[in-house]
Swiss-Prot record:
GO function terms (MF aspect): RNA binding; RNA-directed RNA polymerase activity
Protein family: Belongs to the influenza viruses PB2 family.
Protein name: Polymerase basic protein 2
Organism the protein comes from: Influenza A virus (strain A/Turkey/Ontario/7732/1966 H5N9)
Gene3D superfamilies: Polymerase Basic Protein 2, C-terminal domain
Subunit structure: Influenza RNA polymerase is composed of three subunits: PB1, PB2 and PA. Interacts (via N-terminus) with PB1 (via C-terminus). Interacts with nucleoprotein NP (via N-terminus).
Functional summary from the UniProt entry: Plays an essential role in transcription initiation and cap-stealing mechanism, in which cellular capped pre-mRNAs are used to generate primers for viral transcription. Recognizes and binds the 7-methylguanosine-containing cap of the target pre-RNA which is subsequently cleaved after 10-13 nucleotides by the viral protein PA. Plays a role in the initiation of the viral genome replication and modulates the activity of the ribonucleoprotein (RNP) complex.
UniProt superkingdom: Viruses
InterPro entries reported for this sequence: Flu_PB2_2nd (IPR049110), Flu_PB2_6th (IPR049114), Flu_PB2_C (IPR049115), Flu_PB2_CAP-bd (IPR048298), Flu_PB2_middle (IPR049111), Flu_PB2_N (IPR049106), INV_PB2 (IPR001591), PB2_helical (IPR049113)
Keyword terms: Cap snatching, Eukaryotic host gene expression shutoff by virus, Eukaryotic host transcription shutoff by virus, Host gene expression shutoff by virus, Host nucleus, Host-virus interaction, Inhibition of host RNA polymerase II by virus, mRNA capping, mRNA processing, Viral transcription, Virion
Pfam families: Flu_PB2_1st, Flu_PB2_2nd, Flu_PB2_3rd, Flu_PB2_4th, Flu_PB2_5th, Flu_PB2_6th, Flu_PB2_7th
GO biological process: 7-methylguanosine mRNA capping; cap snatching; DNA-templated transcription; symbiont-mediated suppression of host gene expression; symbiont-mediated suppression of host mRNA transcription via inhibition of RNA polymerase II activity; viral RNA genome replication
Amino acid sequence: MERIKELRDLMSQSRTREILTKTTVDHMAIIKKYTSGRQEKNPALRMKWMMAMKYPITADKRIMEMIPERNEQGQTLWSKTNDAGSDRVMVSPLAITWWNRNGQTTSTVHYPKVYKTYFEKVERLKHGTFGPVHFRNQVKIRRRVDINPGHADLSAKEAQDVIMEVVFPNEVGARILTSESQLTITKEKKEELQDCKIAPLMVAYMLERELVRKTRFLPVAGGTSSVYIEVLHLTQGTCWEQMYTPGGEVRNDDVDQSLIIAARNIVRRATVSADPLASLLEMCHSTQIGGIRMVDILRQNPTEEQAVDICKAAMGLRISSSFSFGGFTFKRTSGSSVKREEEVLTGNLQTLKIRVHEGYEEFTMVGRRATAILRKATRRLIQLIVSGRDEQSIAEAIIVAMVFSQEDCMIKAVRGDLNFVNRANQRLNPMHQLLRHFQKDAKVLFQNWGIEPIDNVMGMIGILPDMTPSTGMSLRGVRVSKMGVDEYSSTERVVVSIDRFLRVRDQRGNVLLSPEEVSEAQGTEKLTITYSSSMMWEINGPESVLVNTYQWIIRNWETVKIQWSQDPTMLYNKMEFEPFQSLVPKAARGQYSGFVRTLFQQMRDVLGTFDTVQIIKLLPFAAAPPEQSRMQFSSLTVNVRGSGMRILVRGNSPVFNYNKATKRLTVLGKDAGALIEDPDEGTAGVESAVLRGFLILGKEDKRYGPALSINELSNLAKGEKANVLIGQGDVVLVMKRKRDSSILTDSQTATKRIRMAIN
């Protein structure tokens, strides 16, 4: 205040004013500052005094033919004096006014195409809805956000090649357009911009806006997708916010959102398979998002989310060096630690082996709804400053920090046994066990933590064990702040490794990510996600598994058929049958498998008993590890539609229905495709008839008349005998059984007796 008063006094004296306004600046340092380099040091001032001159603009000599020397009012538009140091003409700002009114016009057809991003922005704003303004304290935190809606996701280099190819096709220089998106965009833009008269440089700038993601590190309190960021200046100030609903969506935001959903689904599914890493890669490579291969999106899209980063790590891409715990992104800002295994006892006297971080460290913790600064020593929380949207979010952050601190009072606060498992039924590691335990109920943790009196510090208040604010007391070391903690700004990416259980580590061996960190939140994707991998069939429920399994067999029938007869074990081990197993009652899996495999073996042994429909129908059941038992089944149960439904071993059922006339299969009423039966199946399937309810008595016996065909055989009465022509022109004597027997005993004896009868 003193200084200001002094300055005011000085300014009131006329001599001061005179010195400041009239004296020339002759100090070398100052002259140097304002004259060195081409960068304008005071653009506003420069503009002011330039515009005060008569001819502040220079133009090409051609201007003299295109614009008259004087306008209607007789004012001079350009001067005959050359611009010093160039052969350009000095031009008055009035020339621009004249040109805008009288200059030649051009076709506007290309404008919406070149300035597409601007036209689309206007449309979004026109259809957007601005709500009321609320005055309240804004907790803004700086996040890396996408600032230009509607862009493709090309890398700078890829975009550069596309722009050169579209705008300057005749320029020298090698351009390699390899990715699908590059080729599509180039073709599309070349067509759109034929005969375009807009300055090439401008076209290049605008193309860059359309092709490349631009990010800035900005303070944000609300939505972070690009359609919100483009109106950031309208929706949030220091002490106010205005509600806004965008008037349209843009593909880049949809890609980001759908990518996260696809990655989460894939990681969750991979976790429960026999080889998580191999499965994850197979799924990433066979999935498309909005018609683009997921692996291409992963290579280009900078979205940082736990599941997305696990997929990137699996593909060998670099990811951010921060690590994730309890859904918060931790970034160490100072200090260091060494890790040591230590055994600790919970309040329930259960022994846990934890990796203790020894040493002083400081971290920033950033979550979706809360942020914090954490200072800790070996197994001790020194200070935690939290800010969050609401009580719930603040509590979540406090729990995560308390568990992360590894303090003894936290471990002693455990009541009951810790036995949380992941989706694959494996026990979680101790740190995640503790986290899950306290996320379920943190009452004891907060009560046992301890409280302390607090000093009155600007912008900080205390928080009590019941999560209510207080100005006098607070949980030990914990304070709530009005200010958020900025996200980690660096875009640095590091090389990581991933093990088969999808744990991602940096080069020092620190775990950055693991499947436990992947959010369980469900969402509906904006773009269509097409999972071609059989592992994702179950995402739409049991019915989809059933239909997809049979569709897969039918689509690949030619190869399946060969494998069925030559290398069945390899066929049974196909991963496409894995999802189906979850539909078969656990207790019956092994028995069904043993039964079906035996049946198939007989079909292979007995010539002519091949039955396409039956093989397709029963094949998925043979994939489970078989149990050797003499169990016979006339129907097999699958769990769909909330109950067990039957598939008949012989004949149709609502689950599996083959229409002989149309040769089409329907599974649960859904068409599963057309079956191509073997040409000799309908006629020469004698043996299958022999197998079904007939007993082979021996070689042909002339007393029973000429050999019958299969079709005639069905007219026999029970107990009646007849000669039958089988397979390779051999004739045997059979008798229709007096009772309906089991398939297996029939076919076993039939096999042996045919051999005996023929030999």
